[in-house]
Amino acid sequence: MSSKRGADPDWKTPGKASKDKRPKTNAKKQKFRDEEYCKVCSDGGDLLCCDSCPSVYHRTCLSPPLKSIPKGDWICPRCIPLPGKAEKILSWRWALDRSVELRTSKGEKRREYFIKWHGMSYWHCEWIPEGQMLLHHASMVASFQRRSDMEEPSLEELDDQDGNLHERFYRYGIKPEWLLVQRVINHSEEPNGGTMYLVKWRELSYNDSSWERESDSIPGLNQAIALYKKLRSSNKGRQRDRPAPTIDLNKKYEDQPVFLKEAGLKLHPFQIEGVSWLRYSWGQGIPTILADEMGLGKTIQTVVFLYSLFKEGHCRGPFLISVPLSTLTNWERELELWAPELYCVTYVGGKTARAVIRKHEISFEEVTTKTMRENQTQYKFNVMLTSYEFISVDAAFLGCIDWAALVVDEAHRLRSNQSKFFRILSKYRIGYKLLLTGTPLQNNLEELFHLLNFLSSGKFNDLQTFQAEFTDVSKEEQVKRLHEILEPHMLRRLKADVLKSMPPKSEFIVRVELSSMQKKFYKHILTKNFKALNQKGGGRVCSLLNIMMDLRKCCNHPYLFPSAAEEATISPSGLYEMSSLTKASGKLDLLSKMLKQLKADNHRVLLFSQMTKMLNVLEHFLEGEGYQYDRIDGSIKGDLRQKAIDRFNDPVSEHFVFLLSTRAGGLGINLATADTVIIFDSDWNPHNDVQAFSRAHRMGQKKKVMIYRFVTHNSVEERIMQVAKHKMMLTHLVVRPGMGGMTTNFSKDELEDILRFGTEDLFKDGKSEAIHYDDKAVADLLDRTNRGIEEKESWANEYLSSFKVASYATKEDHEEHDDYNNDAENTDPFYWENLMGKSQPKLPKKQKKQSQQSQVDVESIMGKGKRIRKEIDYSNQYPSPNRATPSSIVLM
């Protein structure tokens, strides 16, 4: 038999029309169109020709082999149409024997790719031969191969047909949640009489929703379909069958609400009282601020309050809840646990996802902004959960809805009536407003007024009159008057008042010495800024702030200066050399000793810094020491943040340290599994530090919490705390107009005083007595029988305790003494000249050269001193220094 195709005149390629029916081509083109040899074995003979490509095959070379010649059109395995458009390649493996991919007579292995299809759920992922993928998605395959090891698959080949979800899906990067039905959001009738259901999957965006058939073998789908049908049925009869309210809103809950008892859930007594107060306020039409201290469950109280309105027939919504993006997941969990019958829609995601929500989740009927404005829409959902950003971005749509209630979590976003969030949200149509904040009086009286103005613009509409009425809130009559105004609108309780059985906390200031390297840098920062410091009449405030910021960096670690980091010794692993890294900073040296003991005693640590670059240095340190850790800062968003929290809180977690930036670590984070808090550098704003240690000292904590605040001895850090704390304690209530905000309230004299603090000892030739932490000192420091002043509330809470309204009495002030000297450290106008000018007499040439070389050595690390540049106002990046002070401290 001839090796050429068609040698046998009686054998014709099945399914092919005669050659004369093919498009006529010249011989040269025909050569490239039809192959002459089997695609598999490269031999000739009786060959089967594909109707879709030029390839030809022996029947026996196909896998599985063809027993007979197929009738009609036939296409080879390579050309079999794909089930859909490939979205991405998840993994690859060597083809198994049962594959329909081609085998070679030489036994060569063929690859298969695990494909996620566009518009289809992960349940429909399947293995596709490499040949098919190369034909239809060559660029996708090439991209996958570039970033993957294609020599051997990362996972062992196993049988995936046994129904084992791990072997079929999880091992290839598919999360279990992506296979769980969250809810059915719509349906569509098929022409053949069947029904398709649009399914929203857990932890996936709405644009990942997919159409599924009821007959599909997907766990939980039938139950979700039943709930969907029940919701549609109840929605249709909602207006005509609305039941009368079962419980009077003015009646206070004396026990757990019935719907919580039935679910086996239980509130604390103070939370029951909070829910009752919210219900009463709703009934009276009084907008409110729930200002409980952080960690007392404002989220849960709010959810139960809304659920009580729903369950008792007072209101079915719609309720709008606006929260930080980082807390969305936590709100979803609490709503699902405490209010399972509320239909909650999380309105986040890209344009496509939000379009899906608007189309399928707003109503069972077709909706338009016109019908919503005219209040003709029967809403499908009860609660819409969204972030601040989408309140503004989609105001044209969301602003058309008549909201029964608005809840704003972390309501300090409304402290300025000039903010976009404030202005846009004020235009929404809202029946009742509830603001949640743990720090209602964070800065000044003006910010409090703006919160009240947002709640009730008709009642609180004149800022000047409000400020004039409360010019001095330290006076008893003005405090009393302020209480009368706030009483209907605000409720605040403290942990010390309502959680008597909660483990105590002890906070300590830990004074730390500068290392020799830090002292050299500290001196250089001062000397290179001699001209700015020595200006008669005082330097510019902005210049002094810049100097202070450089000194604060120096107090943390010299490696925060780029040139110093570049000169640092790097280990083969790419990390800083550990000994040099640790010894360069007095704080890090002490931290190293503390962590060793804390790890040995099975404690877990939250480590805060307000500088994200310092967190980078701490990461190098933790990796070098071999400690497992998690990290959250402002760049880590959404579900990644929640995953880190869940990972750390896992009962079997090996993670020892949680790194947090002070600002990012204060919102919606529960880390009560940690019992030690170390504040590496204090924030300007004391509320942020209070929020920081409240991550651990909150409901759910079972151990005493130890809080250590590092402060560099005889430095700007120490003086800032003394000056700021004294100013805040003098005012008692930080609500005086003009205080706080983003501009500093430190005068030039105070700034100069802060910069001078400790410099005499620094520039002395002799050695002063230094604080040293040996093993015994560290053990004493970590002794958990030590007591701070936890029986006192922090000053930050003392001033807020004056605003405990409803039936909550004001606590008496605690007398407190500190080392602050009311007089400036040194008011000599020639101070810097005397310190640095006269202390550097004219030197002989040889000594002068050595001195200059020494200066060059420092400059090679830090830079060549002050250059002409635009002044940078660091007060735009850091809160005002006048707000920085520790709470409940013991000086070590």
From Swiss-Prot:
Regulation of its function: ATPase activity is stimulated by binding to DNA or nucleosomes, but is strongly activated by nucleosomes.
Placement of sequence motif DEAH box: 409-412
Annotated ranges, domain Helicase ATP-binding: 279-458
Cellular localisation: Nucleus; Chromosome
SUPFAM superfamilies associated with the record: Chromo domain-like, P-loop containing nucleoside triphosphate hydrolases
A Gene Ontology term for the protein's cellular component: nucleus
This protein's UniProt keywords: Activator, ATP-binding, Chromosome, DNA-binding, Hydrolase, Metal-binding, Nucleotide-binding, Nucleus, Repeat, Transcription, Transcription regulation, Zinc, Zinc-finger
Residue intervals of the Chromo domain: 84-156, 179-240
InterPro entries attached to this UniProt entry: Chromo-like_dom_sf, Chromo/chromo_shadow_dom, Chromo_domain, DNA/RNA_helicase_DEAH_CS, Helicase_ATP-bd, Helicase_C-like, P-loop_NTPase, SNF2-like_sf
GO annotation, biological process: chromatin organization; chromatin remodeling; nucleosome organization
Region (Disordered): 1-29, 839-892
Biased composition (Polar residues): 874-892
Sites where the protein binds ATP: 292-299
Similarity annotation: Belongs to the SNF2/RAD54 helicase family.
Subunit comment: Monomer.
Protein name: Chromodomain-helicase-DNA-binding protein 3
